[in-house]
UniProtKB/Swiss-Prot annotation:
GO cellular component, one term: cytoplasm
Taxonomy of the source species: Archaea, Methanobacteriati, Methanobacteriota, Stenosarchaea group, Halobacteria
CXXCXGXG motif repeat extents: 161-168, 178-185, 204-211, 218-225
Compartment(s) of residence: Cytoplasm
Organism per entry: Haloquadratum walsbyi (strain DSM 16790 / HBSQ001)
J domain boundaries: 4-68
A molecular function GO annotation: ATP binding
Designated name of the protein: Chaperone protein DnaJ
Low complexity bias spans: 121-133
InterPro entries: DnaJ (IPR012724), DnaJ_C (IPR002939), DnaJ_domain (IPR001623), HSP40/DnaJ_pept-bd (IPR008971), HSP_DnaJ_Cys-rich_dom (IPR001305), HSP_DnaJ_Cys-rich_dom_sf (IPR036410), J_dom_sf (IPR036869)
Length: 387
Protein backbone atom coordinates (compact mmCIF):
# COMPACT_ATOMS: atom_id res chain seq x y z
CA UNK A 1 0.00 0.00 0.00
CA UNK A 2 1.30 3.48 -0.86
CA UNK A 3 2.02 5.97 1.88
CA UNK A 4 -1.03 8.01 2.90
CA UNK A 5 -0.80 11.73 2.00
CA UNK A 6 -1.56 12.75 5.59
CA UNK A 7 1.32 10.56 6.79
CA UNK A 8 3.63 12.03 4.14
CA UNK A 9 3.09 15.52 5.57
CA UNK A 10 2.82 14.31 9.17
CA UNK A 11 -0.60 15.90 9.84
CA UNK A 12 -3.88 14.58 11.18
CA UNK A 13 -6.95 14.06 9.00
CA UNK A 14 -8.57 17.03 10.75
CA UNK A 15 -5.74 19.41 9.87
CA UNK A 16 -6.84 22.68 8.32
CA UNK A 17 -5.27 24.37 5.32
CA UNK A 18 -2.82 26.44 7.37
CA UNK A 19 -1.58 23.36 9.23
CA UNK A 20 -1.08 21.52 5.93
CA UNK A 21 0.84 24.41 4.36
CA UNK A 22 3.01 24.77 7.44
CA UNK A 23 3.79 21.05 7.43
CA UNK A 24 4.55 21.20 3.69
CA UNK A 25 7.01 24.07 4.12
CA UNK A 26 8.80 22.25 6.93
CA UNK A 27 9.04 18.99 4.97
CA UNK A 28 10.01 20.74 1.72
CA UNK A 29 12.80 22.63 3.48
CA UNK A 30 14.11 19.34 4.88
CA UNK A 31 13.95 17.24 1.71
CA UNK A 32 14.47 19.76 -1.11
CA UNK A 33 17.06 18.13 -3.42
CA UNK A 34 19.16 21.30 -3.45
CA UNK A 35 19.70 21.32 0.32
CA UNK A 36 19.11 17.78 1.61
CA UNK A 37 21.81 15.17 2.11
CA UNK A 38 19.25 12.35 2.06
CA UNK A 39 19.96 10.05 -0.95
CA UNK A 40 16.18 9.66 -1.44
CA UNK A 41 15.47 13.38 -1.13
CA UNK A 42 14.18 13.83 -4.69
CA UNK A 43 11.64 11.00 -4.38
CA UNK A 44 10.49 12.19 -0.96
CA UNK A 45 10.17 15.76 -2.23
CA UNK A 46 7.92 14.58 -5.08
CA UNK A 47 5.65 12.78 -2.59
CA UNK A 48 5.52 15.87 -0.38
CA UNK A 49 4.53 18.09 -3.33
CA UNK A 50 1.86 15.63 -4.45
CA UNK A 51 0.42 15.37 -0.93
CA UNK A 52 0.25 19.14 -0.64
CA UNK A 53 -1.35 19.47 -4.09
CA UNK A 54 -4.19 17.12 -3.15
CA UNK A 55 -4.77 18.15 0.46
CA UNK A 56 -4.85 21.90 -0.27
CA UNK A 57 -7.45 21.48 -3.03
CA UNK A 58 -10.89 21.36 -1.43
CA UNK A 59 -12.55 19.08 -3.99
CA UNK A 60 -9.56 16.76 -4.40
CA UNK A 61 -9.17 16.40 -0.65
CA UNK A 62 -12.83 15.53 -0.20
CA UNK A 63 -12.60 12.91 -2.93
CA UNK A 64 -9.37 11.57 -1.42
CA UNK A 65 -11.01 11.22 2.00
CA UNK A 66 -14.02 9.45 0.51
CA UNK A 67 -12.18 7.07 -1.83
CA UNK A 68 -9.06 6.35 0.20
CA UNK A 69 -5.46 6.58 -1.01
CA UNK A 70 -5.27 3.64 -3.42
CA UNK A 71 -8.69 4.11 -5.04
CA UNK A 72 -8.04 7.84 -5.41
CA UNK A 73 -4.79 7.18 -7.26
CA UNK A 74 -6.53 4.66 -9.52
CA UNK A 75 -9.25 7.18 -10.34
CA UNK A 76 -6.63 9.84 -10.98
CA UNK A 77 -4.79 7.61 -13.45
CA UNK A 78 -8.06 7.02 -15.31
CA UNK A 79 -8.68 10.76 -15.54
CA UNK A 80 -11.54 10.71 -13.07
CA UNK A 81 -10.08 13.35 -10.74
CA UNK A 82 -10.55 16.97 -11.73
CA UNK A 83 -8.89 20.03 -10.27
CA UNK A 84 -10.78 21.80 -7.56
CA UNK A 85 -12.24 25.20 -8.25
CA UNK A 86 -10.94 26.42 -4.92
CA UNK A 87 -7.17 26.07 -4.85
CA UNK A 88 -6.67 28.47 -2.00
CA UNK A 89 -5.16 25.83 0.19
CA UNK A 90 -7.40 26.86 3.07
CA UNK A 91 -9.67 24.73 5.18
CA UNK A 92 -12.91 26.07 3.71
CA UNK A 93 -14.18 23.23 1.53
CA UNK A 94 -17.79 24.23 1.05
CA UNK A 95 -20.68 22.04 2.21
CA UNK A 96 -19.02 18.62 2.67
CA UNK A 97 -22.33 16.80 2.26
CA UNK A 98 -24.03 19.05 -0.27
CA UNK A 99 -26.52 17.97 -2.89
CA UNK A 100 -28.35 15.31 -0.87
CA UNK A 101 -31.19 17.37 0.48
CA UNK A 102 -29.54 17.84 3.86
CA UNK A 103 -29.28 14.09 4.45
CA UNK A 104 -25.58 14.38 5.34
CA UNK A 105 -24.42 11.54 3.07
CA UNK A 106 -20.61 11.47 2.84
CA UNK A 107 -20.86 10.50 -0.83
CA UNK A 108 -23.04 13.42 -1.93
CA UNK A 109 -20.46 15.57 -3.70
CA UNK A 110 -18.47 12.78 -5.32
CA UNK A 111 -21.50 11.15 -6.98
CA UNK A 112 -22.76 14.54 -8.11
CA UNK A 113 -19.37 15.32 -9.62
CA UNK A 114 -19.24 12.09 -11.60
CA UNK A 115 -22.91 11.39 -12.34
CA UNK A 116 -24.63 14.76 -12.00
CA UNK A 117 -28.20 15.38 -10.94
CA UNK A 118 -29.79 16.66 -7.77
CA UNK A 119 -28.95 19.95 -6.19
CA UNK A 120 -25.27 19.41 -6.94
CA UNK A 121 -25.91 20.89 -10.38
CA UNK A 122 -26.87 24.25 -8.97
CA UNK A 123 -24.65 27.18 -9.79
CA UNK A 124 -21.20 27.07 -8.23
CA UNK A 125 -19.65 29.90 -10.21
CA UNK A 126 -20.19 32.39 -7.40
CA UNK A 127 -18.06 30.50 -4.94
CA UNK A 128 -14.91 32.31 -3.77
CA UNK A 129 -11.95 31.35 -5.95
CA UNK A 130 -8.28 31.97 -5.36
CA UNK A 131 -6.52 34.25 -7.83
CA UNK A 132 -3.83 33.07 -10.20
CA UNK A 133 -0.19 32.76 -9.19
CA UNK A 134 2.14 35.31 -10.78
CA UNK A 135 5.85 35.10 -11.50
CA UNK A 136 8.69 37.63 -11.45
CA UNK A 137 12.48 37.68 -11.09
CA UNK A 138 15.02 39.39 -8.84
CA UNK A 139 18.77 39.66 -9.39
CA UNK A 140 21.29 39.37 -6.57
CA UNK A 141 24.98 40.02 -6.15
CA UNK A 142 27.14 37.35 -4.55
CA UNK A 143 27.59 39.60 -1.51
CA UNK A 144 23.81 39.63 -1.02
CA UNK A 145 23.72 35.85 -1.31
CA UNK A 146 26.41 35.64 1.37
CA UNK A 147 24.60 37.81 3.93
CA UNK A 148 20.96 37.36 2.96
CA UNK A 149 19.03 40.48 2.08
CA UNK A 150 15.66 42.17 2.16
CA UNK A 151 15.15 42.90 -1.52
CA UNK A 152 12.74 45.53 -2.79
CA UNK A 153 11.31 45.14 -6.27
CA UNK A 154 8.47 46.31 -8.48
CA UNK A 155 5.96 44.03 -10.19
CA UNK A 156 3.04 44.73 -12.51
CA UNK A 157 0.05 42.69 -11.43
CA UNK A 158 -3.73 42.67 -11.84
CA UNK A 159 -5.69 44.67 -9.29
CA UNK A 160 -9.41 44.98 -8.77
CA UNK A 161 -10.72 47.68 -11.10
CA UNK A 162 -11.29 50.85 -9.06
CA UNK A 163 -14.21 52.04 -11.21
CA UNK A 164 -16.39 48.91 -11.18
CA UNK A 165 -14.98 47.36 -7.99
CA UNK A 166 -14.10 44.21 -9.89
CA UNK A 167 -17.60 43.57 -11.25
CA UNK A 168 -16.65 44.19 -14.88
CA UNK A 169 -19.79 46.25 -15.50
CA UNK A 170 -21.41 49.47 -14.26
CA UNK A 171 -23.61 49.06 -11.20
CA UNK A 172 -26.68 50.20 -13.16
CA UNK A 173 -26.17 47.79 -16.11
CA UNK A 174 -29.13 45.58 -17.01
CA UNK A 175 -28.71 41.87 -16.27
CA UNK A 176 -30.02 38.85 -18.15
CA UNK A 177 -29.72 35.09 -17.79
CA UNK A 178 -26.80 33.46 -19.58
CA UNK A 179 -28.24 31.59 -22.60
CA UNK A 180 -25.49 28.95 -22.65
CA UNK A 181 -25.96 27.60 -19.12
CA UNK A 182 -29.51 28.90 -18.50
CA UNK A 183 -28.37 30.68 -15.39
CA UNK A 184 -26.80 27.61 -13.77
CA UNK A 185 -23.22 28.86 -14.07
CA UNK A 186 -22.14 25.42 -15.27
CA UNK A 187 -22.31 23.31 -18.38
CA UNK A 188 -22.52 19.51 -18.40
CA UNK A 189 -20.64 16.99 -20.53
CA UNK A 190 -20.91 13.20 -20.72
CA UNK A 191 -17.91 11.01 -21.52
CA UNK A 192 -16.83 7.39 -21.41
CA UNK A 193 -14.16 6.37 -18.87
CA UNK A 194 -12.85 3.18 -17.36
CA UNK A 195 -15.57 3.59 -14.73
CA UNK A 196 -18.26 3.70 -17.40
CA UNK A 197 -20.26 6.66 -18.67
CA UNK A 198 -19.85 9.63 -16.37
CA UNK A 199 -21.33 13.08 -16.35
CA UNK A 200 -19.15 16.01 -15.39
CA UNK A 201 -19.75 19.69 -14.95
CA UNK A 202 -17.53 22.65 -15.63
CA UNK A 203 -17.74 26.39 -15.22
CA UNK A 204 -19.67 28.02 -18.04
CA UNK A 205 -17.12 29.67 -20.35
CA UNK A 206 -19.54 32.35 -21.51
CA UNK A 207 -20.55 33.85 -18.16
CA UNK A 208 -17.54 32.57 -16.22
CA UNK A 209 -19.79 30.79 -13.78
CA UNK A 210 -21.95 33.72 -12.73
CA UNK A 211 -25.05 32.56 -14.65
CA UNK A 212 -25.66 36.16 -15.65
CA UNK A 213 -24.69 38.52 -18.46
CA UNK A 214 -24.79 42.31 -18.51
CA UNK A 215 -25.75 44.77 -21.20
CA UNK A 216 -22.76 47.02 -20.51
CA UNK A 217 -19.12 46.48 -19.66
CA UNK A 218 -16.83 48.73 -17.65
CA UNK A 219 -14.93 51.05 -19.96
CA UNK A 220 -11.89 51.12 -17.67
CA UNK A 221 -11.21 47.37 -17.52
CA UNK A 222 -13.22 46.33 -20.63
CA UNK A 223 -15.26 43.93 -18.55
CA UNK A 224 -12.31 42.07 -17.05
CA UNK A 225 -12.85 43.44 -13.57
CA UNK A 226 -9.11 44.04 -13.16
CA UNK A 227 -6.48 46.51 -14.34
CA UNK A 228 -2.70 46.06 -14.33
CA UNK A 229 -0.89 48.25 -11.83
CA UNK A 230 2.60 48.50 -10.42
CA UNK A 231 3.21 47.38 -6.85
CA UNK A 232 6.42 47.80 -4.85
CA UNK A 233 7.11 44.82 -2.60
CA UNK A 234 10.00 43.52 -0.50
CA UNK A 235 11.03 39.95 0.16
CA UNK A 236 13.43 38.46 2.70
CA UNK A 237 15.97 36.37 0.79
CA UNK A 238 17.86 33.87 2.95
CA UNK A 239 21.64 33.61 2.88
CA UNK A 240 22.91 30.79 0.69
CA UNK A 241 20.17 30.88 -1.94
CA UNK A 242 21.26 29.66 -5.36
CA UNK A 243 20.78 30.87 -8.89
CA UNK A 244 17.55 29.44 -10.33
CA UNK A 245 15.78 28.80 -7.03
CA UNK A 246 12.26 30.14 -6.50
CA UNK A 247 10.75 31.92 -3.52
CA UNK A 248 7.02 32.14 -2.84
CA UNK A 249 5.23 35.19 -1.44
CA UNK A 250 1.79 34.06 -0.36
CA UNK A 251 -1.23 36.18 -1.26
CA UNK A 252 0.74 38.61 -3.45
CA UNK A 253 -0.49 37.26 -6.79
CA UNK A 254 -3.61 38.10 -8.79
CA UNK A 255 -6.81 38.97 -6.88
CA UNK A 256 -9.35 36.20 -6.34
CA UNK A 257 -12.90 36.01 -7.66
CA UNK A 258 -16.04 36.43 -5.58
CA UNK A 259 -14.14 37.40 -2.47
CA UNK A 260 -11.57 34.63 -2.81
CA UNK A 261 -7.96 35.16 -1.67
CA UNK A 262 -5.15 36.37 -3.87
CA UNK A 263 -2.87 33.91 -5.58
CA UNK A 264 0.82 33.69 -4.73
CA UNK A 265 3.80 35.48 -6.25
CA UNK A 266 6.65 33.20 -7.36
CA UNK A 267 10.05 34.91 -7.40
CA UNK A 268 12.80 33.38 -9.54
CA UNK A 269 16.25 34.22 -8.17
CA UNK A 270 19.10 35.12 -10.52
CA UNK A 271 22.65 35.59 -9.16
CA UNK A 272 25.05 37.80 -11.13
CA UNK A 273 28.50 36.47 -12.01
CA UNK A 274 31.23 37.78 -9.70
CA UNK A 275 34.43 39.25 -11.19
CA UNK A 276 36.70 37.40 -8.73
CA UNK A 277 34.92 34.30 -7.47
CA UNK A 278 33.33 31.29 -9.11
CA UNK A 279 30.68 29.40 -7.17
CA UNK A 280 30.18 25.64 -7.12
CA UNK A 281 27.40 24.73 -4.72
CA UNK A 282 28.36 26.59 -1.55
CA UNK A 283 32.11 26.53 -2.27
CA UNK A 284 33.94 29.44 -3.87
CA UNK A 285 36.99 29.34 -6.15
CA UNK A 286 39.58 32.10 -6.52
CA UNK A 287 42.73 32.37 -8.66
CA UNK A 288 45.67 33.93 -6.83
CA UNK A 289 48.72 35.29 -8.65
CA UNK A 290 52.05 34.90 -6.81
CA UNK A 291 55.64 35.58 -7.80
CA UNK A 292 58.30 32.99 -8.48
CA UNK A 293 60.21 33.77 -5.25
CA UNK A 294 56.99 33.42 -3.24
CA UNK A 295 56.43 30.00 -4.78
CA UNK A 296 60.03 28.92 -4.17
CA UNK A 297 60.54 30.20 -0.63
CA UNK A 298 56.95 30.25 0.61
CA UNK A 299 55.02 33.29 1.78
CA UNK A 300 52.03 34.55 3.73
CA UNK A 301 49.62 36.39 1.42
CA UNK A 302 46.34 38.25 1.71
CA UNK A 303 43.39 36.57 -0.01
CA UNK A 304 40.09 38.37 -0.67
CA UNK A 305 36.86 36.81 0.58
CA UNK A 306 33.25 37.77 -0.05
CA UNK A 307 33.12 39.73 3.20
CA UNK A 308 36.71 40.99 3.49
CA UNK A 309 40.16 39.39 3.53
CA UNK A 310 41.98 36.48 5.13
CA UNK A 311 45.57 35.21 5.14
CA UNK A 312 46.94 32.14 3.42
CA UNK A 313 50.29 30.47 4.03
CA UNK A 314 51.94 29.51 0.74
CA UNK A 315 54.29 26.62 1.40
CA UNK A 316 57.80 26.56 -0.09
CA UNK A 317 58.01 24.78 -3.42
CA UNK A 318 54.42 25.48 -4.42
CA UNK A 319 53.68 24.66 -8.07
CA UNK A 320 51.56 26.67 -10.45
CA UNK A 321 47.99 25.34 -10.44
CA UNK A 322 48.23 24.00 -6.89
CA UNK A 323 45.07 24.48 -4.83
CA UNK A 324 44.69 25.52 -1.19
CA UNK A 325 41.54 25.16 0.90
CA UNK A 326 40.39 27.80 3.37
CA UNK A 327 37.57 26.39 5.47
CA UNK A 328 34.32 28.25 6.16
CA UNK A 329 35.07 31.14 3.79
CA UNK A 330 32.53 30.09 1.17
CA UNK A 331 28.76 30.66 1.04
CA UNK A 332 26.53 29.85 4.04
CA UNK A 333 24.43 26.74 3.56
CA UNK A 334 20.77 27.46 3.04
CA UNK A 335 18.76 27.12 6.28
CA UNK A 336 21.90 27.88 8.32
CA UNK A 337 23.65 24.51 8.47
CA UNK A 338 27.28 25.58 8.15
CA UNK A 339 29.34 27.31 5.46
CA UNK A 340 31.14 26.25 2.32
CA UNK A 341 34.88 26.60 1.74
CA UNK A 342 37.10 28.87 -0.34
CA UNK A 343 39.50 27.14 -2.73
CA UNK A 344 42.49 29.19 -3.85
CA UNK A 345 44.30 28.10 -7.01
CA UNK A 346 47.81 29.49 -7.26
CA UNK A 347 49.11 30.87 -10.55
CA UNK A 348 52.84 31.69 -10.67
CA UNK A 349 53.38 34.89 -12.63
CA UNK A 350 56.47 35.11 -14.82
CA UNK A 351 57.81 38.68 -15.06
CA UNK A 352 58.01 39.95 -18.61
CA UNK A 353 60.92 42.37 -18.08
CA UNK A 354 63.99 41.49 -16.00
CA UNK A 355 66.74 43.82 -14.92
CA UNK A 356 70.29 42.75 -15.67
CA UNK A 357 70.83 41.96 -12.00
CA UNK A 358 67.70 39.80 -11.84
CA UNK A 359 68.66 37.95 -14.98
CA UNK A 360 72.18 37.20 -13.72
CA UNK A 361 70.84 36.00 -10.37
CA UNK A 362 68.38 33.63 -11.99
CA UNK A 363 70.95 32.30 -14.43
CA UNK A 364 73.27 31.61 -11.51
CA UNK A 365 70.39 29.87 -9.75
CA UNK A 366 69.74 27.69 -12.76
CA UNK A 367 73.42 26.83 -13.21
CA UNK A 368 73.71 25.89 -9.55
CA UNK A 369 70.97 23.38 -10.20
CA UNK A 370 73.02 21.71 -12.92
CA UNK A 371 71.30 23.29 -15.90
CA UNK A 372 73.22 24.65 -18.86
CA UNK A 373 71.86 28.09 -19.51
CA UNK A 374 71.90 29.76 -22.87
CA UNK A 375 72.18 33.50 -22.34
CA UNK A 376 69.78 34.08 -25.21
CA UNK A 377 67.16 32.08 -23.36
CA UNK A 378 67.05 32.83 -19.68
CA UNK A 379 65.46 30.81 -16.92
CA UNK A 380 62.05 32.49 -17.04
CA UNK A 381 61.90 32.06 -20.79
CA UNK A 382 62.38 28.34 -20.21
CA UNK A 383 59.51 28.38 -17.75
CA UNK A 384 57.34 30.19 -20.29
CA UNK A 385 58.13 27.67 -23.02
CA UNK A 386 57.26 24.76 -20.75
CA UNK A 387 53.61 25.86 -20.49
Amino acid sequence: MSEDFYDVLGVSRNADGDDIKQAYRKKAAKYHPDVSDDPNAEEKFKKIKKAKEVLTDGEKRQMYDQLGHDRFQQAEKRGGVGGGGNSSGGSARGDPFGGMGGQGSPFGDIFEQFFGGGQGQRRQGNRPRQGQNLQTRVQLDLEEVYTGVEKQFTVRRPEKCPDCNGRGHPSDADVRTCPQCNGQGQTTTVRETALGRVQQTQTCPRCDGSGEMYTQTCSTCNGDGVTRQEATLSVDIPAGIRDGQTLRMEREGAPGDNGGPRGDLLIDVSVRDHPDFERDGDDLYYRLAISFPQAVFGSTVEVPTVNGETTLDISAGTQSGEEFRIRNEGIPHLRGRGTGDLYVQVQIVTPENLSQKQREALEAFAEAGGESVDVSQGFFEKIKSSF
